């Protein structure tokens, strides 16, 4: 995890891995580059039932990622409040990329983008012995693409206003 997301996950009593342990790098450019890394995306995008993918993945010596939880930068909130904050810095790049990659691979990975789904995630994990079921993962993938679509639409609207 990065930043506040990890704190929220730990507050719920769950463990999470600091993103730098997977990326094997530190944040760069004042936090603009945190998660854009081939190690991380390898864990998110490889097909776990594909022997060649698995072989390539094992050579990377990084953990499987089963759950991705991302809270996107609050661009809409700052936009709606006419804040003086530089809105360009509130455009999340890594977050949408992470959840979209995880959702593309929903057969194996759960992506969570809404805080109100944290409890649903916990319930699904408890119901399925520490795993999530395919229907839950697919529903969460739908939410990801719906959420990122709205997020991009607001950014596009703002850019068109200038």
Q: Where do the model's predicted regions map?
A:
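Internal alpha/beta core interface subdomains
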Residues: 62-162
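Short hydrophobic alpha-helical runs that function as membrane-insertion/retention elements
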Residues: 1, 17-18, 110-112
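Glycine-rich nucleotide/cofactor/substrate-binding loop typically near the N-terminus or early
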Residues: 4-75
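Short, polar loop motifs at secondary-structure junctions
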Residues: 2-5, 96
């Amino acid at each position: 995890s990065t930043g506040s997301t990890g704190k929220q996950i730990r507050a719920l009593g769950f463990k999470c891995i600091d993103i730098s342990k997977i990326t094997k790098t530190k944040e760069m450019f004042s936090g603009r580059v945190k998660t854009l890394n081939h190690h991380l995306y390898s864990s998110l995008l490889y097909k776990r039932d594909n022997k060649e993918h698995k072989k390539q993945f094992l050579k990377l010596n990084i953990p499987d990622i089963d759950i991705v939880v991302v809270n996107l930068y609050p661009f809409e909130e700052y936009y709606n409040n006419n804040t003086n904050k530089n809105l360009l810095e509130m455009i999340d790049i890594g977050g949408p990329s992470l959840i979209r990659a995880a959702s593309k691979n929903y057969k194996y990975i759960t992506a969570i983008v809404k805080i109100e789904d944290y409890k649903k995630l916990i319930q699904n994990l408890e119901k399925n012995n520490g795993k999530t079921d395919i229907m839950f993962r697919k529903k969460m993938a739908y939410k990801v693409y719906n959420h990122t679509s709205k997020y991009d639409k607001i950014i596009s609207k703002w850019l068109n206003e200038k």
